[in-house]
């Protein structure tokens, strides 16, 4: 009887932990979906930023697929809590069969400060997101988001890019980047 009572008490103590984990997972899924929808629904894209450099490449992998990478580096201003997310080939959230590449969203927070790095504090020289594709060319809608030092202002820039064997090309529907 004492063993049964001990097991019941132990189980009742573990159940709230499971509920908290489920709540955390739901919150992270909602955050991911919100960013996914923001990227997918953006209608205004720029071709370059005044605040950092974007570059990219796509390479063939031995199994016949392709791996692509988008690199953000060379910050011109202090950028805190940077988030990057790409959505491949205009795939709707409900149709996505894989996680889209992102950094700073569901993982650690990263900051970029010109001419400084401190990996212990997550101050980095650059960020990379990468993904896999069955095709030699991939079209990405990309969001780059960051905050100022006080974290009281947030900035977002959207890009529509194509990666292929020739490198990265930027598509824009704006006449200027202002």
Predicted feature locations:
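C-terminal motif of bacterial Sec signal peptides marking the signal peptidase cleavage site
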Residues: 14-17
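N-terminal export/targeting and maturation segments
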Residues: 19-104, 109-111, 116-121
């Amino acid at each position: 009887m004492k063993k049964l009572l001990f097991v019941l008490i132990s189980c009742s103590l573990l159940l709230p932990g499971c509920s908290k984990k489920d709540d955390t997972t739901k919150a992270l899924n909602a955050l991911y979906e919100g960013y996914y929808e923001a990227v997918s629904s953006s209608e205004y894209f720029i071709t370059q930023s005044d605040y950092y450099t974007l570059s990219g490449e796509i390479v063939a992998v031995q199994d016949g697929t392709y791996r692509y990478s988008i690199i953000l580096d060379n910050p011109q201003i202090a950028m805190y809590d940077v988030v990057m997310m790409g959505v491949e080939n205009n795939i709707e959230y409900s149709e996505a069969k894989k996680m889209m590449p992102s950094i700073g969203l569901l993982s650690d927070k990263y900051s970029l400060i010109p001419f400084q790095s401190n990996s212990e504090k997550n101050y980095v020289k650059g960020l990379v997101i990468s993904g896999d594709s069955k095709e030699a060319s991939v079209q990405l809608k990309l969001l780059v988001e960051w905050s100022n030092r006080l974290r009281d202002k947030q900035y977002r820039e959207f890009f529509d890019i194509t990666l292929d064997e020739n490198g990265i090309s930027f598509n824009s529907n704006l006449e200027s980047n202002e």
